[in-house]
Amino acid sequence: MPKFDVSKRDLERLVGKEFTVEEWEDLFLYAKCELDDVWEENGEIYFKADSKDTNRPDLWSAEGIARQIRWALGFRRGLPEYEVEKSDVTVYVDEKLKDIRPYGVYAIVECLKLDEEALKQMINLQEKVALTFGRRRREVAIGIFDFDKVKPPIYYRAAEKTEKFVPLGFEEELTLEEILEKHEKGREYGHLIKDKPYYPLLVDSEGKVLSMPPIINSETTGRVTTETRNVFVDVTGWDLNKVMLALNVVVTALAERGGRIKSVKVVYPDFEIETPNLTPKSFEVELDYIRKLAGLDLSDGEIKDLLERMMYDVTLEDGKAKLLYPAFRDDIMHARDVLEDVLIAYGYNEIEPEEPKLAVQGRGDKFIEFEDAVRELMVGFGLQEVMTFNLTNREAQYGKMNLEYGRDYFNNPPAELVEIENPISPKWSALRNWLLPSLLDFLSQNTHEEYPQRLFEVGKATLIDESRETKTVSESKLAVVLAQPRVTFTDTKEILDSVMRHLGFEYELEEVEHPSFIPGRVGKVIVKGKAIGVIGEIHPSVLEKWGIEMPVAGFELFLRPLYTEPYL
C-alpha cells in the first residue's frame, strides 16, 4: 500500500482549520489512510500516511487528503467543480508508437504558487501514481514540465536510439541508448522499452526534448522549482482510460493549490481528443440496499447527506439515489462501493457492535488447507510463489500461446473463456481458464531480474459449465515454470514426480500435440485414467511473443482430483 509523508502545517493550510495530532489520527480515516508515524523536523510536525486503498490515487497526496477531509467535515458538499479552459496547444502522436507506448494525454496548469512542501507533494504524487497505480511505470508514467520553456505545438514521436538530449540531473548530452545504460532511471525502467525498434520522445516545435517516456525528463524543461508558475503535464501508457484517470488525479491536485487547468488537443493518427476530461461520472443505487447492508436505519435524507459529504451530487427518485461523482475516481463499480463511502462518512467507530445471534465454531476449509499444504510443498522444492491476476484477455490466453480459440486442449485450456461484456480495459476483458499464460506474463515483466527464475502459483481458473446455475465453475490449479539456461522437460518432470509422490498418486504421461509447447516435448498428465494437466517445454515462438529470451519449461495441474484426506 502507498505510504507518503505530509506536513501537518500544509494539510491544515489546505483544509482551512488546525487540529491536534490526536484529531488527525481520526481524520485520516476519512481519506482511507492510517497515521503510521509522527515526527518533528526543523520545528515542523510531519505525518507518515499509510493509504489502505490502491484504487484511490486521488488520496495519495496532501491535496487529496485535505480535499476529502474538507468534504467529510461538511466544509464543502456535493461534487467538486473544476473549470477547464480551452488552450490553443496541440500534441501530435506518432503512429509508430502504436506498439511501443501508444497513448499520451496532456494538460496545462497555470498560475501555481509552489513552496517547498507543495513541490514535494507534486513530485510524491507523480511518483506514487506511476509506481503503484501505474505498475512501476509500465501502465502509467507521468512527466511535469516548466511550460514557460516549451514552444507548442508538441510532438510525441518515435525516435532513433542515437538521438541525444541532456537528461534530468546530467550536464552533458547522452544518446537514448546511453540514457538506459548510464542514468539511474534508465537502468531502473529501461526494460520497459529496451527491446523496441524506436524509443518514445516528447519534443516541442523547436525540437527541444521534454522527456523520454517512461524513463526521464530533460534537464532543459523537466526541472520544476518553486519559481515555476505554469506547468505542462504529460501521462503516457498502454490504456487510454488509465492514463486519463492519472491525468485527472494530477491536475485536480494542482488545482487544489490554486492552479488554473487548461485543456490540450491530442491528435492521434485515427482520432483526436481534448484532455483532461473532468466530466463527472454517474451511478445509481437502491437506497434500501444501502440500509440493508449497512445495518443502519438511515432515512433517505441522511443517506443523501452522507454521500454529499463524500463528494457526490445526489438526486433522490423512486427509492433510488442517482449519483454524480468526480472524474478523478474510477473505483465505483458496484453498489457496495457507494455503501463503503456512506459508512466512511457515517464513521465506522459510530457503528454499534452486535454479538452473533448463532453459536458457531469456525475452522479452516479443508480444501483450502490442502492448497496451503501444496504451497508449502512447492516452497520446499525451492520455488518462489507468485500471485497473478484472475482477469486477463483472449490474446494472452490463446493468441500469445499459439492456440486457436474455440478448440479444446484437454481443458488446458478449454475451448472458450468467460468474457466480460463491458470491460473497463481490453487488457482485463476475461477470466483466465489456465494459469501458465499468467506466469509467462510475470516472467516477461521480470526479464531484467537474475536467473534462474523458478516460479509457481496455486490459483483459480474459471471454466464454462452449463450445468451450473452460474454457468461457470472455479477450479483450483497448480502451475509451475522454470526459466533458466538449458532447462529441459526432465527438470520439470522431476518436480512433477515429487509432487505426485508426496500427494500419494501414481500418474502416466501421454505424448500429445499442444501448440504452446515444443513438439515431442509435451505430455498429458493422467491420473486414474483422467487427464488432469499438461507438462512440457514452452515453444520458442510463444516465448518470443511474450518477449522472453530464456528457455522455459513448466506444467499445470487441476488440484481437485489430487485432494484426499489425510494429505501430504
From Swiss-Prot:
GO terms for molecular function: ATP binding; magnesium ion binding; phenylalanine-tRNA ligase activity; RNA binding. The keyword Amino-acid biosynthesis does not apply. InterPro entries: aa-tRNA-synth_II/BPL/LPL, B3/B4_tRNA-bd, DNA-bd_dom_put_sf, Phe-tRNA-ligase_IIc_bsu, Phe-tRNA-synth_IIc_bsu_arc_euk, Phe-tRNA_synthase-like_B3/B4, Phe_tRNA_ligase_beta2_arc, PheRS_beta_core. GO terms for cellular component: phenylalanine-tRNA ligase complex. Its cofactor is Mg(2+). It is found in: Cytoplasm. SUPFAM superfamilies: Class II aaRS and biotin synthetases, PheT/TilS domain, Putative DNA-binding domain. Mg(2+) binds at D331, D337, E340, D341. Its main location: cytoplasm. It holds the Pfam family B3_4. It is an enzyme of class 6 (ligase). The keyword Acyltransferase does not apply. Keywords: Aminoacyl-tRNA synthetase, ATP-binding, Cytoplasm, Ligase, Magnesium, Metal-binding, Nucleotide-binding, Protein biosynthesis. Its EC number is 6.1.1.20. Residues 278-353 form the B5 domain. PROSITE patterns: B5 (PS51483). One of its GO terms (biological process) is phenylalanyl-tRNA aminoacylation. It catalyses: tRNA(Phe) + L-phenylalanine + ATP = L-phenylalanyl-tRNA(Phe) + AMP + diphosphate + H(+). Tetramer of two alpha and two beta subunits. Belongs to the phenylalanyl-tRNA synthetase beta subunit family. Type 2 subfamily. This is Phenylalanine--tRNA ligase beta subunit.
